[in-house]
A protein has these predicted regions:
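Catalytic cores of Mg2+-dependent Asp-rich isoprenoid enzymes
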Residues: 1-166, 171, 175-289
């Protein structure tokens, strides 16, 4: 395939990535330039698929959204057989070839998006964790693979951090997800704390609800701490010095979202906590020092 076409496809993915707000850095300047393009390609692949599952601009039934995801899966298959034509998949095809990315990790992301279409309630925390295994954990593993790191212990610690990041996003986005008729707070926890779906829809900001979110935040903080050892493990990898800074910045960003939730006394029904520019600069300083 022509190098100019591959380069323009990577640029397309970069432009798409930079248009979207995220809590956490996506291929920041801490990532070496030669690695950054691969992260842009993976992000663009996942971002588009996520839009199929979520965005209101797509008309039609659940079946229509699932059909779009199946079509995306077909294009993923094509990129593994050298038949990619879409800019995202041209860039992704180069990425999976250069970084030896197993298709199963990318398919896991698509399975999470399918689940978003099919499922809107979770009976218990284990169900939520199972969702995170597809929606979040592959991302950390993909980043490690881009840096040519294949280590089961590191993968395990990365999974802890990625799950925690996904959970932090859930508690941050309770208000947003309700608009999509989606609740990630485990139903058995809601029963335990005396909170119903109706309470959430009516934005009933009770002490019971705040205690419920406090409980979710505390269990998420434990996962962040359990994954923190990844940074020490990575210090033994000469090729990952800058990656450590990137991952630590991401880790701090997730922790800061939880701090923002605490600062509003867990009232995520009325307010969506968000990192501002000052917060991000502060986190960068913490990462470097």
């Amino acid at each position: 395939m022509q190098e100019s076409l591959i380069n323009s496809s990577f640029k397309y993915c970069e432009d798409l990535t930079k248009k979207h707000y995220e809590n956490f850095p996506v291929a920041s300047l801490l990532i070496p330039k030669d690695k950054r393009k691969y992260i842009y390609a993976i992000y663009a692949f996942a971002r588009a698929a996520d839009d199929f599952a979520d965005e209101p601009g797509i008309e039609g039934s659940k079946e229509k959204r699932l059909a779009l995801l199946d079509e995306w899966n077909g294009k993923l298959n094509d990129c593994y057989t050298g038949k990619a034509y879409d800019p995202i998949f041209i860039a992704l095809s180069a990425t999976v070839k250069d970084c030896d990315i197993p298709k199963e990790l990318l398919e896991s992301l698509l399975n999470a998006f399918r689940q978003d279409v099919k499922k809107s309630r979770y009976e218990n925390f284990n169900e939520v964790l199972d969702y995170c295994k597809n929606s979040a954990n592959p991302v950390g593993r993909l980043v490690l693979l881009i840096f040519d790191i294949q280590n089961d212990e590191m993968f395990g610690k990365s999974d802890k951090i990625c799950t925690a990041l996904q959970l932090a996003n859930f508690w941050q986005d309770v208000k947003v997800d309700l608009l999509k008729d989606r609740i990630y707070i485990p139903e058995d926890d809601m029963v335990q704390f005396g909170v119903s779906d109706v309470d959430l829809v009516n934005k009933n900001d009770s002490s019971a609800f705040r205690n419920l979110i406090n409980f979710q935040v505390e269990r998420t903080e434990k996962l962040f701490e359990e994954g923190k050892e990844l940074f020490e493990l990575l210090k033994n990898e000469s090729k990952s010095k800058r990656l450590i800074f990137e991952l630590k910045l991401t880790w701090l960003g997730g922790k800061e979202i939880l701090n923002k939730i605490k600062a509003i006394d867990y009232d995520v029904l009325k307010t969506r906590p968000k990192l501002n520019l000052f917060d991000k600069l502060k986190l960068i300083m913490k990462t470097i020092i």
